[in-house]
Amino acid sequence: MKRAYGFLVAVSLLSGPTVFAQDLSRYRDFVLESSVDTVAAASGVRATEAQTLHARPAKIQELQWRAPYVNPAITTADPVRDVAFTFFNDALYQVVVTYSRDRTEGLTNNDIIESLSASYGAPVPRSAIARTDLAADVLLENTVLAQWNNAASSITLLRDTYSPEFQLIVSSKPLTARARTAIREAIRLDALDAPRREAEQRKQDVADTEAARDKVRSTNKTAFRP
């Protein structure tokens, strides 16, 4: 119950403006550049649940929050289905919010944009949307509906290309740039290291097989009676 409470106490973006109006570095109680421990405490998720996606050259971690089941008949339930928090060296650089289809059913794109504008101000003109702030796979699978931008942060509202699902991405521009560079380098290093790791794994598999065979032999030899 603690996990649900920790997230639901925050004011819903779809139910009106927050006291942190037009602060693009914040989503509800979560502030960009916060630590894993800080985000975990605010969400009710244990910090130990954070997964390390890459350990070098920088530590990239992800912490997931998922909404508990709520009776669909409760119309005041939180519209958020899940949230993914991503960290660069223990600093929150991206928040990806996915809204429940049940809670956004019937809402138009403009309905969502108007609600977010109450918190973040007017979005930038469509011609000024910075698509480079978004990963290529995100742009491939989603339509950008609106964006809020300043020098340090960006907030982008997306809709799935193939389904009526809305997402909100809140990101730190400088940390996102550093994280992307680190992730590319991590992938490169992993590829270089793959042959060695595969050889070590094969060696370990052989050793494990031999150890298991020796254990069975020892057990059966002791118990065997002609």
Roles of regions detected by a PLM:
Residues 6-16:
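Bacterial N-terminal signal peptides
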Residues 17-21:
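Sec/Tat signal peptide C-region and signal peptidase I cleavage site
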Residues 6, 22-24, 84:
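Short, functionally important structural connectors and interaction interfaces within domains
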Residues 22-57, 99-226:
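Non-cytosolic coordination micro-motifs
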Residues 1-4:
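Positively charged n-region of N-terminal signal peptides that target proteins for export
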Residues 12, 76, 86-88, 137-139, ...:
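Sterically constrained small-residue positions within well-ordered secondary structures
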Residues 60-107:
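Mid-chain, structured segments of secreted extracytoplasmic proteins
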